[in-house]
């Protein structure tokens, strides 16, 4: 309980300093929150095709490689990207759809691989939770096809499949 008394005493000292600093501020200023302007866009105005185009432009600004594919040809598109990048081995989350996995590439399912093990794998292949066109941001949620966070951080290359309906123009 000695530690608790010390923390409580320190708390009182800090609060006392705050009260002293605010002693000459009128009560009205302390309780009234100023109105904040909300002039930013809360909703997008682009068509679905425009949203995808904007995302592609922003992603390319980050030097991302983009390959458009139908759902049924994702595995072929991934194999093409792997060939372009010289990727011989991929780590994937267990929940990644089977048809996204390319043929001709060594695919290792991640069941808790250590960081050192991941460091020896060329690339990770994951899905995404969402993507934001305005910023070119990809959101991973650490679940399902996104896999563990380490998959997008440790291998030198991250290949991410983003479905068109997952791309939003902006976030309110």
What are these regions (language model features)?
Residues 1-172:
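The feature marks the mature, well-folded catalytic cores of soluble enzymes
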């Amino acid at each position: 309980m000695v530690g608790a008394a010390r923390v409580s005493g320190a708390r009182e000292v800090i609060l006392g300093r705050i009260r002293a600093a605010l002693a000459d501020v009128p009560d009205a200023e302390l309780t009234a929150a100023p109105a904040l302007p909300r002039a930013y866009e809360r909703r997008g105005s682009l068509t679905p095709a425009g949203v995808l185009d904007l995302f592609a432009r922003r992603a390319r600004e980050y030097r991302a490689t983009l390959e458009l594919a139908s759902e049924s040809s994702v595995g072929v598109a991934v194999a093409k990207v792997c060939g372009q990048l010289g990727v011989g081995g991929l780590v994937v989350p267990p929940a990644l759809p089977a048809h996204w996995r390319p043929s001709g590439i060594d695919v290792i399912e991640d069941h808790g691989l250590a960081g050192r093990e991941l460091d020896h794998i060329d690339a990770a292949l994951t899905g995404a939770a969402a993507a934001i066109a305005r910023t070119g941001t990809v959101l991973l949620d650490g679940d399902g096809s996104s896999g563990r966070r380490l998959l997008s951080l440790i291998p030198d290359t991250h290949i991410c499949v983003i479905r068109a309906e997952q791309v939003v123009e902006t976030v309110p």
